[in-house]
Every structure is written in structure tokens, then in C-alpha cells.
């Protein structure tokens, strides 16, 4: 495996002692590791046996390429990934108020997300290409320190006891992890079918139900979920 990283940035001194930077950052990963199950029943086998009774069709071992064996994991190095981001950074390190602030707008895509994932179709890497599990589209982080003005001009014991105090904090906001609804089937984890309707749940219910489950149903055995 190897990766290629590149970036282009512009830095500038701004008014009020603020330093600013805006950058494009990219990364390409090639020959990444994955461990697909090469003995998983293919969709072609499922389609070819669609006319069989359900009891026979649900016996996944009878549909495996290598009969008599369960999962066979093969380590391959044929996966790819790419990352593209706009990064904005600002810092002020002088005066009573100092801070550093950064914002990242990014997207990370790959056809694998760890060499042990259980992909729905290990024979079709293009179908598995999409956002990785650690993808966060928006990340905002700021750290700040404010030097309290109380007793700043005092001297001696009064200043040592009550002066020189600072208030500081760290704030971070980021978008959540993307979610792909899946379900367990006879051939492993499968994507669900989107049947329409609003996915997001508004109001207080969103803390109990993260998304509208009625918008998804199990996909048929003979094709991939949407």
C-alpha cells in the first residue's frame, strides 16, 4: 500500500494581529489492504437458483463457489481511497484574547474501510465505493484564552493572589457519521432498499429513533439493495 499527499495553501497576516491560512489538502491511497470472503455466494448464483424452494435457496453453503467450506478470507491489496478537503485556519497569539480556529470541509471515499470489513459484494469493488466510516464532512474546532482584567495593575500580594487569572476553553462541532441501513441475510450483511419518504426524524423523537425506519425495507435476495 502507498499514499500520495498534496496541498496548496495561502497564508496572510490579517488586521488585529490575526494570522490566516486557507488550504486545499488531498490524499490518494493505492493498493490498500482488504480481506474479502471469496467463498461468499454471488448474486449470479442467487439469480440462477431463484426458482428453487425457499428452504433450498436459503442454504447458503449450497450456493458457495467452494462447496464444503465456510468463509474463505483472502488478503488482497487492490483497494483505493481518496480524500479532498478545504481547510481554513486563523490564530491570534497576542493581547488579552488569544485563539486558534480551524474549519475543515472534506470528503473521504474508498472501496474498503479497514482490511476486515464484510462487504456486501466482494466481487464488485465499484459497488462498495463510497464514504468511509470515519468521514466527517464538516469539522469546526476553536481554542481560546482570555486574560481577565481584574487586578491587572495591582502589585505585591494582591496581584499574586487575585491577578493574572485566565479563562480558557475548547469548542468542537462536527457532523455525524454517515449511516447505511443494513440487515442480516443468508449471504451476510445486505443493504436495505430505500422506498421513499423523509429519512430524518424531527423533534424529540430523533433522540429515540435516529431515522425513519419506514423508509427502508429488506432487499430481495436476487439483487443488491439501493
Language-model features, listed with the residues they occupy:
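Short, solvent-exposed micro-motifs at the edges of structured domains
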Residues: 1-226
